[in-house]
Amino acid sequence: MFAVIKTGGKQYRVAANDVLTIEKLEAAAGDSIEFTEVLVIGEGADAAIGAPFVTGASVKAEVVEQNRGKKVIAFKKRRRQNSKRSRGHRQHHTVVRITDIVAAK
């Protein structure tokens, strides 16, 4: 069974025991979280498609760790002016493991 969940402005196709990196959530490592914005749930032809979300469906997960992504450099240069500016950014991420997919009753 799989589900498509929405979190952090993105959509992820998940199944049980999947490990995925998502946008930062306020939760410590080892905490249990629940995603209620489920867009699709099921398997094959009997998949339930929400409008926009499947009522009563949820996906349970546990937080594995909090980390940061690779550094992205924003570099601006003004030609012939001997002027440049460099700025780095590292996005915060949360790594979660999907533990259970609960279908609507």
From Swiss-Prot:
Keywords linked to the UniProt accession: Ribonucleoprotein, Ribosomal protein, RNA-binding, rRNA-binding
Q: Give the stretches traversing the membrane.
A: none
* A GO term, aspect molecular function: rRNA binding
The reply to whether Signal figures as a keyword in the UniProt entry is no
* Alphabetized Pfam families for the sequence: Ribosomal_L21p
- Cellular compartments per GO CC: cytoplasm; ribonucleoprotein complex; ribosome
A Gene Ontology BP annotation from the UniProt entry: translation
Its domain of life reads Bacteria
Query: What family does this chain come from, according to its entry?
Result: Belongs to the bacterial ribosomal protein bL21 family.
Q: What does this protein do?
A: This protein binds to 23S rRNA in the presence of protein L20.
Quaternary state and interactors: Part of the 50S ribosomal subunit. Contacts protein L20.
Q: Under which name does UniProt file this protein?
A: Large ribosomal subunit protein bL21
